[in-house]
Amino acid sequence: MSDSDGSKRPSETPDAADSDSKRQRGSSKSPVDVDEELNAILGANGISELEAASGNANQQDIMDIDFDNLPAELLQKDDIQADRNSVGRSTSGSQTPQPIKSESMINVPQSSQISRPIIRPAMPSAPVVPSSSAPVNRMNPLVQQANSIHGLNTSSIDNRTAPNFSTGHSTGQAGGNNQDRFHTNDPSKLNDALAAAGVDIGREEELLQQQQYNRAPRINVQQPSYLQSRPARQIQRTPFLNSYHLGTFMQRVARENGVLQSFMSDNELLELMSASCEQWISHIATKTVLLSRHRRRGIPALKNKKLAANQIPRSEVSKELRNLALKQKELEEQRVSRRILLGLENKDANSESNKVGAEETLHRAANETAAMMTSNKKKYSWMSSGAGNGDDSKAMEREKDKQSHLLALRGDNGLRFRDIRTGDSVTMKDLLAALEDERMGVNKAIMKGYARLKD
């Protein structure tokens, strides 16, 4: 066999026969030379026909011819590889895959020894089966979820397609079964993940509905009706001071200080001032009551803790006042004795003038004693039962012994303890003492209080 250039090709050798047998067994592991394949399949007549079809057999390479004219038996080989450029194959549909020439293959420099390209087949890809429906966003509650579970994201499962394990495309009943298999709009068919996890969709929906039903009555019970809450709100909103009078007073004070502002329309400010005044007055009243209690109740003495049943506890203030009265009594006795020495007083107690004065004094004392017996006012110690055993009776006897006959002629029956006439009431002194501890806004009030104070 001779080529187009006149060179003779060697006859087939045992190695060529072995390669032919391997090719027939379908081995695709070792690359195969294109020239050997052409020689083995076409023979001398086939090659000459290809050269004649190419039009330029002397200058054009055999592989530069149109690949469409090659026999289908050569193009269906799976063990063809390319040593320089990779060649792709088209696998769309059921058409016969054909090799594709690249520009680098065409621009191969002409030389005496040209390496033949070895073509490798591309992996067959499965045909893409278009989905019957558009993907549904199951996480969006506004999208209509037909025959599906609300809130369950199954978009990734909806987009799944059944793999085509056959070389051809799937038709007929097989495609319908695959679509029914991966269709997730029916909750009963989600058995791949939910059943394995042990989730019962129907039971979960019933529990959610039951929880929402149980929450509704509790919310209604906690919220009171308008008729029940209206009186309480009105009581809380009642201000301590009248809003009109408070706003008028604040506007007058602001005008005196050069501020032109109307406070009548600002209700929040009026409520704040009313609450502040209430707190300040409460503080002053509490402090006044405490001072009045301290004034009426002194520090208890450590001695004579056990008092008689009819004995009245005396305060330290009453005792001090009594001591001052005793000193004044002694000074008065000294003054009367000096008047007697000067002849200004009668020493004789049995004179007529002294008897008349003593009778008037006794008559006045008798009337006062009768009034005490008929009323609930303070009584003398001798008017109460068992008074002879008390300490007050002994004190009265000592007072009688100390009593001067000169003062007795004037109707002085001796000194007694001065109890507080105000009782448990709060006086102006207590209020002024409470205001004196304040720092601001009390100067005028203190001056007016001391001006009106009566001893």
From Swiss-Prot:
InterPro entries: TAF4_C. Its main location: nucleus. GO terms for biological process: DNA-templated transcription initiation. It holds the Pfam family TAF4. Residues 247-323 form the Histone-fold domain. It comes from the Eukaryota. Residues 314-370 form a coiled coil. It is found in: Nucleus. Keywords: Coiled coil, Nucleus, Transcription, Transcription regulation. Belongs to the TAF4 family. This is Transcription initiation factor TFIID subunit 4. It comes from Meyerozyma guilliermondii (strain ATCC 6260 / CBS 566 / DSM 6381 / JCM 1539 / NBRC 10279 / NRRL Y-324).
